[in-house]
Amino acid sequence: MSLKLDGKKLSLEIEEKLKKDIESNINSTKRPPGLAVIRIGEDPASGVYVKNKERACARVGIKSFIFHLKDTIDQKEVEQLINKLNLDNDIDGMLLQLPIPDKFDEQRLISLINPDKDVDGLNEKNIGKLVKNEPGMRSCTPAGIVNLLRSQNITIEGKKIVVVGRSLLVGKPLSLMLLNLNGTVTITHSKTINLKKICKEADILIAAAGKPNLINSSYVKDGAVIIDVGIHRLTSSDKSQTKLCGDVLLEDVIPKVYAYTPVPGGVGPMTVTMLLVNTIFSWQKQFVLLSRLSDLLP
């Protein structure tokens, strides 16, 4: 029987540790960790994600500061807010909820976030530290995936790993993390020739292409580990029902694999949990506290 990599279960276990970490240090810091989330516009999915982050913060004892800005605001005003939050000592972590409306210069806004508060790990300084394998903020979804693999003692070193997708959020940073952990990494994308053949050579196959049900059993070798990063809401042909699925046709793949992540309940919960880890790590760093979280930051 295939092993389910239960991200929801692992995330709750890590959250318990985070809660205890905050409780044991709050007397010396005199304040909880603080996370600022900047949301621009009315993208409905962003609203759900921000609410999930707010709830997760509350569960472990992080104080969240939500800045919901109308899309009529201009670039300069958002930049001013980021600069203000950079100087706010009650804010340990900050993120720009993506996507944002096209009129904004997304990369410039991210580059303005203090690298020590960049809990999404997207600032170029943190990307550079990842490239050089130096300590720094790590992108949440890739870090969550590494922790899922480690939780079940799945070996990364020396394994053939194929990442389908090259986004700055997942594909690129994840490939670098796995390379730093001595995996033999191949990164593929929409222009890759013979994708199926390449995928079938993988000991660990990670689907982060953003295409529903792209990967079926013909892409996967027997005994592989498959990580599904995608999440999509599909509507039935008569529009009477919707269901969530990932980039992997799981019911087709599960009989062949050693381990897999479900959708939902796999990678998603770990992404939010790693955001909490990064925020608390920044808080501990500011107060020069002994951190027990470094093993969670690949």
From Swiss-Prot:
The keyword Oxidoreductase applies. One of its GO terms (cellular component) is cytosol. Keywords: Amino-acid biosynthesis, Histidine biosynthesis, Hydrolase, Methionine biosynthesis, Multifunctional enzyme, NADP, One-carbon metabolism, Oxidoreductase, Purine biosynthesis. Coiled coil: none annotated. One of its GO terms (molecular function) is methylenetetrahydrofolate dehydrogenase (NADP+) activity. NADP(+) binds at residues 165-167, 190, 231. It catalyses: (6R)-5,10-methylene-5,6,7,8-tetrahydrofolate + NADP(+) = (6R)-5,10-methenyltetrahydrofolate + NADPH; (6R)-5,10-methenyltetrahydrofolate + H2O = (6R)-10-formyltetrahydrofolate + H(+). InterPro entries: Aminoacid_DH-like_N_sf (IPR046346), NAD(P)-bd_dom_sf (IPR036291), THF_DH/CycHdrlase (IPR000672), THF_DH/CycHdrlase_cat_dom (IPR020630), THF_DH/CycHdrlase_CS (IPR020867), THF_DH/CycHdrlase_NAD-bd_dom (IPR020631). Pathway: One-carbon metabolism; tetrahydrofolate interconversion. Its EC number is 1.5.1.5, 3.5.4.9. One of its GO terms (biological process) is methionine biosynthetic process. Homodimer. Catalyzes the oxidation of 5,10-methylenetetrahydrofolate to 5,10-methenyltetrahydrofolate and then the hydrolysis of 5,10-methenyltetrahydrofolate to 10-formyltetrahydrofolate. Belongs to the tetrahydrofolate dehydrogenase/cyclohydrolase family. This is Bifunctional protein FolD. The gene is folD.
